[in-house]
């Protein structure tokens, strides 16, 4: 079953806060839900499907369904880390195409900043019973050093330089300066990225994403519902999912699951990488962006460093503007899960609602990509191709 043009994104909302010590998780979920529904011109009573991941407090989606007073025909709580929300968009479209629902609400919320969570340097053990724990935990894997391993290997194989990775952060900062809600709005240089403290060689502090509270929400609807709303019609053209694993230790750190998820999304959409005018790329670290761009086909494998160092990611300058809200590197990474805001900014670009300084002229085709887990071990990749009708 194809989902091409079988569903539309009608509402988006990003919570303006980046620090929420005064709000509960449930409150944040409800606030972003209200915001996205208001953006779509719909109400809670219109929602007949709800999608969330384990950031939602309580028993799967059940507690938030009760808290928000939802009356549903369908729900889904797929959990694949930071890629969960790009996956949810695809799954919502599938449910709509199958006739299981017509208005799907997707929410994300988190409070890692308020809770003082040391996200990048805490042991990466999700569940002591997981089969991989005994093989990896003794070596002390944390988020930062697993991504650093990928960066180091990419440098060894392809000659990528730290200065090239820094250009990803430079591009993000150029965009974030125009976002009044961005956590970091100061434009930085390659030299400043290189001078920031080393976190896990070769990744510096400014190679790492921000830690923020807040959240976001999306409303995915059937085409007939979209036609009745006073919002630009944003169609889902294609979607792809993939996972990549160490395969019993035979891991290649130079590529990600985007190699497969991107191909599937492009095939369903019937477009090529060269057709895309704007990209939202998961940016947990600068190396994540470089490798993902390569694997999605926007540049040759091993040439991602050169591609970004040529300024290609800066809106108004390069050939492939990315993360024009500032992305996870400068703007927002709510709950340490970045794919929600990637979809939100892609929709803004397609609607022509991004800041005028970063808006892509006549943007009609965009891509949003999420990564969940760690590209250094097992991870999920999910790619969406979106179209303005």
Locations of regions flagged by a protein language model:
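Active-site-proximal alpha-helical scaffold in enzymes
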Residues: 80-110, 144-178, 218-224, 333-354
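Beta-strand segments within the central parallel beta-sheet cores of soluble alpha/beta enzyme folds
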Residues: 44-53, 74-76, 104-109, 163-170, ...
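Molybdopterin (Moco) oxidoreductase catalytic core of the xanthine/aldehyde oxidoreductase family
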Residues: 133-139, 160-164, 180, 303-307
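Short glycine/threonine-rich loop-to-helix capping motif typified by GTGT followed
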Residues: 56-67, 248-252, 283-306, 313, ...
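Conserved active-site "lid/cap" helical segment
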Residues: 1-83, 91, 95, 150, ...
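Conserved catalytic cysteine-centered active-site region
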Residues: 3-5, 53-146, 184-210, 239-244, ...
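Condensing-enzyme catalytic core mediating Claisen C-C bond formation in acyl metabolism
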Residues: 1-26, 133, 167, 198-260, ...
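Extended C-terminal subregions enriched in glycine
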Residues: 255, 259, 263-286, 295-298, ...
């Amino acid at each position: 079953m194809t989902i091409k043009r079988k569903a539309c994104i009608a509402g988006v909302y990003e919570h303006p806060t980046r620090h929420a010590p005064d709000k509960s998780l449930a409150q944040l979920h409800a606030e972003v839900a209200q915001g996205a529904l208001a953006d779509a011109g719909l109400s809670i009573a219109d929602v007949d499907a709800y999608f969330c991941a384990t950031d939602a407090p309580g028993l799967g989606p059940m507690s938030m369904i009760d808290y928000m007073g939802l009356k549903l025909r369908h729900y889904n709580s797929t959990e694949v880390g930071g890629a969960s929300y790009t996956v949810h968009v695809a799954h919502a479209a599938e449910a709509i195409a199958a006739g299981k629902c017509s208005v799907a609400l997707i929410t994300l919320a988190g409070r890692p900043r308020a809770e003082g969570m040391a996200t990048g340097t805490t042991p990466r053990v999700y569940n002591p019973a997981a089969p991989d724990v005994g093989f990896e935990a003794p070596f002390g894997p944390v988020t930062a050093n697993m991504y650093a391993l990928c960066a180091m290997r990419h440098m060894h194989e392809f000659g990528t330089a730290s200065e090239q990775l820094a250009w990803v952060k430079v591009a993000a900062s150029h965009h974030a300066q125009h976002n009044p809600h961005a956590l970091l709005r100061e434009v930085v240089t390659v030299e400043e990225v290189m001078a920031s403290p080393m976190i896990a060689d070769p990744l510096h502090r400014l190679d790492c994403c921000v830690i923020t509270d807040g959240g976001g929400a999306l409303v995915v609807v059937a085409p007939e519902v979209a036609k009745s709303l006073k919002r630009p019609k944003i169609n889902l053209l294609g979607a792809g999912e993939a996972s990549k694993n160490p395969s019993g230790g035979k891991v290649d750190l130079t590529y990600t699951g985007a190699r497969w998820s991107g191909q599937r999304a492009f095939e369903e959409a019937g477009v090529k990488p060269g057709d895309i005018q704007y990209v939202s790329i998961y940016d947990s670290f600068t190396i994540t962006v470089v490798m993902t761009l390569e694997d999605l086909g926007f540049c040759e494998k091993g040439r991602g460093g050169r591609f970004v160092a040529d300024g290609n990611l800066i809106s108004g300058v390069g050939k492939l503007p990315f993360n024009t809200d500032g992305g996870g590197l400068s703007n927002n990474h709510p709950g340490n899960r970045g794919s929600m805001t990637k979809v939100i900014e892609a929709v803004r670009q397609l609607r022509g609602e991004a800041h005028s300084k970063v808006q892509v002229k006549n943007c009609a085709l965009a891509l949003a990509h999420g990564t969940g887990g760690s590209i250094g071990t097992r991870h999920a990749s999910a790619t969406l191709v979106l179209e303005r009708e």
